[in-house]
Amino acid sequence: MNIDLSNFDTKNVTDMYGMFCGCKSLTNLNLSNFATKNVTNMRKIFYGCTSFTKIDLSNFDTKNVTDMSWMFSNCKALKGIDLSKFNTQYVNNMSGMFSGRESITNIDLSNFDTKNVTDMSWMFNRCKSLANLNLSKFDTKNVKDMSYMFVRC
């Protein structure tokens, strides 16, 4: 299934919680014109999109997002994703963000600003194919919950 949302006007949207959650047959999604600068909640936005193999989020403006929990969880076929333009300066919840990404081998989070994150629980749970994960720049001084962060990796 393909969905073209290139004409959606999302400039006033603040909450995208679960927007595509459980879209198991969704393979292609055109989000090229999605305006996300006012969004604060992206929790579970792509949760369970098991047929995704790639998704272009290069136009996503995440500077105001505070919740990215379970964002890509159970996107089992998604092998790679470019998050280099993600601004995570205000994010406080990254719980389960990549949980269940069984096909992914590498995640580059070198640009992630984690100084305000308090919850990283389940973040990389079941990332079974992950061969490289550099978290050397992660600032974890405010994190309160790291339970099950790397379980079944």
Regions found by a protein language model. Give the residues of each.
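Negatively charged
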Residues: 1-153
